[in-house]
């Protein structure tokens, strides 16, 4: 088999190891896609933004490599508002109507919403079938497709119903980034910046130096950013697959960010609410400011993080109209909390983060109100 000329691979070790493949043209590689299908039943799950560009090609590539496949398809509306129990039920129904057996495979073709929903359906159908992640957004390539965290949202909060279900493979075709809207590219770069902020000062500096190339969608710069981000996440996930300890560090900014997303209403095509990456960007600044207020981080490092996010065109302030008390109420439902006490990922400066139990709510409220 001939390998793509620029293929990068990242191995995720653990009880269920898998490979992240990163290169252009991978969605057309039917043999690569089909090798992960153990049986004959495949459900291709996508959304209304991605499916028109790529679903037919993926279907054709799979059937060319495996003409015996029985292939079903489910397309949901694009946007975080689709990550619901209702759409989860549609995915389960699609698997049932397909006659999917325990050797079936769900292909998640899309961004983080599709990946989370498809992964959760795969985790639950017959107590677990294979899922292959085909991320088409930068955010999904560097974060949500890797690590096996799957979930849907409910009105009370984000990702509150889900399961750990590692994918059989992650296949990231970087050609899909060519059709990614600029706002979505920047949202993904927020998660990329997070990796530098929590564990890699040199990567943080590289991102500053390469910011123009990354924002312009330079393929080489993006491939390097994706591979480095995946390496960071793979290292942590291998040591802590079920988020019992250090994996929580990957959530820098997420407790604040999820509260913003839930309180304002989820970002989606047609509204101006912050999307996930934008909310995480604001959340990282809030976490850094709280860390500085608690004497954990230097104000100069906090400003360096805020500046870098701003240079990438990302928001750094809470949207107007969100009450601090309401945001704190959302934060109290965060999955990292223990015994009803806030447990936050805070910052020690560029390249250092830690989980802090029992954070003073008054200090958090002061940051939210400032």
Curated annotation (Swiss-Prot):
Its cofactor is NAD(+); Co(2+); Zn(2+). It comes from the Bacteria. Zn(2+) binds at residues 191, 254, 276. NAD(+) binds at residues 112-116, 136-137, 149, 158, 176-179. It is found in: Cytoplasm. GO terms for biological process: amino acid biosynthetic process; aromatic amino acid family biosynthetic process; chorismate biosynthetic process. Keywords: Amino-acid biosynthesis, Aromatic amino acid biosynthesis, Cobalt, Cytoplasm, Lyase, Metal-binding, NAD, Nucleotide-binding, Zinc. Its main location: cytoplasm. SUPFAM superfamilies: Dehydroquinate synthase-like. It is an enzyme of class 4 (lyase). InterPro entries: Dehydroquinate_synthase, DHQ_synth_AroB, DHQ_synth_fam, DHQS/DOIS_N, DHQS_C. One of its GO terms (cellular component) is cytoplasm. Pathway: Metabolic intermediate biosynthesis; chorismate biosynthesis; chorismate from D-erythrose 4-phosphate and phosphoenolpyruvate: step 2/7. It catalyses: 7-phospho-2-dehydro-3-deoxy-D-arabino-heptonate = 3-dehydroquinate + phosphate. Its EC number is 4.2.3.4. Binds 1 divalent metal cation per subunit. Can use either Co(2+) or Zn(2+). GO terms for molecular function: 3-dehydroquinate synthase activity; metal ion binding; nucleotide binding. Catalyzes the conversion of 3-deoxy-D-arabino-heptulosonate 7-phosphate (DAHP) to dehydroquinate (DHQ). NCBIfam families: aroB. PANTHER family: 3-DEHYDROQUINATE SYNTHASE (PTHR43622), 3-DEHYDROQUINATE SYNTHASE, CHLOROPLASTIC (PTHR43622:SF7). HAMAP family: DHQ_synthase. Belongs to the sugar phosphate cyclases superfamily. Dehydroquinate synthase family. This is 3-dehydroquinate synthase. It comes from Xanthomonas campestris pv. campestris (strain ATCC 33913 / DSM 3586 / NCPPB 528 / LMG 568 / P 25). The gene is aroB.
């Amino acid at each position: 088999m001939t390998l793509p000329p620029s293929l990068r691979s990242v191995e995720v070790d653990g009880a269920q190891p898998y490979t992240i493949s990163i290169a252009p043209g991978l969605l057309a590689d039917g043999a690569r896609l089909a090798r992960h299908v153990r049986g004959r039943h495949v459900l291709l799950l996508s959304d209304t933004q991605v499916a028109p560009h790529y679903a037919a090609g993926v279907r054709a590539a799979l059937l060319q490599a495996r003409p015996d496949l029985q292939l079903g398809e489910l397309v949901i509306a694009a946007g975080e508002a689709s990550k619901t129990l209702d759409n989860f039920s549609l995915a389960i129904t699609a698997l049932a109507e397909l006659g999917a057996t325990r050797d079936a495979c769900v292909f998640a073709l899309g961004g983080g919403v599709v990946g989370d929903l498809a992964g959760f359906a795969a985790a639950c159908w017959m107590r677990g079938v294979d899922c292959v992640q085909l991320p088409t957004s930068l955010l999904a390539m560097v974060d949500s497709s890797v690590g096996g965290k799957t979930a849907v949202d409910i009105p009370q909060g984000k990702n509150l119903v889900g399961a750990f279900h590692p994918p059989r493979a992650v296949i990231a075709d970087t050609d899909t980034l060519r059709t990614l809207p600029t706002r979505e590219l920047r949202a993904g770069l927020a998660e990329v910046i997070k990796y530098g902020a929590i564990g890699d000062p040199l990567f943080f500096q590289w991102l500053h130096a390469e910011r123009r190339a990354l924002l312009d969608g330079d393929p080489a710069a993006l491939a390097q950013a994706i591979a480095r981000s995946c390496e960071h996440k793979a290292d942590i996930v291998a040591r802590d697959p079920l988020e019992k300890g250090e994996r929580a560090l990957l959530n820098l900014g997420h407790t604040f960010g999820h509260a913003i997303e839930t309180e304002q209403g989820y970002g989606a095509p047609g509204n101006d609410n912050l999307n996930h990456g934008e909310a995480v960007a604001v959340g990282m600044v809030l976490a850094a400011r709280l860390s500085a207020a608690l004497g954990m981080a230097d104000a100069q490092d906090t400003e360096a993080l805020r500046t870098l996010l701003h240079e990438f065109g990302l928001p750094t302030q809470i949207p107007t109209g969100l009450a601090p008390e309401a945001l704190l109420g959302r934060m109290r439902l965060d999955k990292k909390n223990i015994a009803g006490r806030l447990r936050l990922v805070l910052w020690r400066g560029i390249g250092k983060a830690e989980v802090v139990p029992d954070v003073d709510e008054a200090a958090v409220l002061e940051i939210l109100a400032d």
